[in-house]
Amino acid sequence: MKIQIIWLTLVLIVVEANAVKQGKNATIPALIVFGDSIMDTGNNNNLPTLLKCNFPPYGKDYPGGFATGRFSDGRVPSDLIAEKIGLAKTLPAYMNPYLKPEDLLKGVTFASGGTGYDPLTAKIMSVISVWDQLIYFKEYISKIKRHFGEEKAKDILEHSFFLVVSSSNDLAHTYLAQAHRYDRTSYANFLADSAVHFVRELHKLGAQKIGVFSAVPVGCVPLQRTVFGDKELDGVILYINVYDTLFDMIQHPKKYGFEVADRGCCGKGLLTISYLCNSLNQFTCSNSSAYIFWDSYHPSKRAYQVIVDNLLDKYLSKVY
């Protein structure tokens, strides 16, 4: 527990020190998101990576039933948060080649499924690193200035909500590949330093209102239960504060109206993710709302909604 608490505290100190609270009637002009598959709305679609989900049954509960590249049966937290703060029902992926300049005004997500703070994570998965996401963010601000002027760019930087959601893939996958260099404590410290550095770099670029989600209880998702069983994967992996809600949902599913917590809806739900979750798999459930997880790693649309409803107002009230 001590490692996670230190990590979370380090990140939140940076965020809150740089946040200037606005008046009660303040509006949020845009939502800008960085991170991994939890927030990816399609940035991986045109990448040379196996971590894609722009095919059925992904998106079966999305408006129109379309598979858009979201790692869930429906909308993901970036969409739900954008709607909750009054911007739009969906948040566009920055890498969408069909985006028009006006589509940028209410925000975008740079998140890329499979990435993390550790540069090796993105390299292994052939996805967009969080550090490259910062480069794309600079490009985004340049586009805003070019099409809508300096004042609009200033408004977005000063008053938008910036959200960073990463580290789950570092903990679930890359840590084991880095075991020759790090033990659990030193790897946690490396990720903590990386998280703080990322937030500081984002603030240097002008962001003022930054929220940071810590890692999900990775050892409790179906894939990790299946692969690692009862091996010792506690410590940094299990109990990070921001996802207390998800951990409680996994431990007490009926409390939140769920029936299944130990496997995903897609396929048999234990080792079913990306291309293994496909329309040929005859075992996909008919009622994803009964499941906390959609596939073996990602929560269902309904689970995401519970998390957003439980956390967003509490944390937004600190800076707005």
Swiss-Prot record:
Location relative to the cell: Secreted
E.C. designation(s): 3.1.1.-
Major subcellular location class: secreted
GO biological process, one term: lipid catabolic process
GO molecular function: lipase activity
Active-site annotation: S37, D295, H298
Keywords for this protein: Glycoprotein, Hydrolase, Lipid degradation, Lipid metabolism, Secreted, Signal
InterPro entries hit by this protein: GDSL (IPR001087), GDSL_lipolytic_enzyme (IPR050592), Lipase_GDSL_AS (IPR008265), SGNH_hydro_sf (IPR036514), SGNH_plant_lipase-like (IPR035669)
EC category name: hydrolase
Recorded superkingdom: Eukaryota
This protein's record includes keyword Secreted: yes
GO terms under cellular component: extracellular region
Residues making up the signal peptide according to the UniProt record: 1-19
Glycosylated residues, chain numbering: N25, N287
UniProt record similarity statement: Belongs to the 'GDSL' lipolytic enzyme family.
This protein's name: GDSL esterase/lipase At3g43570
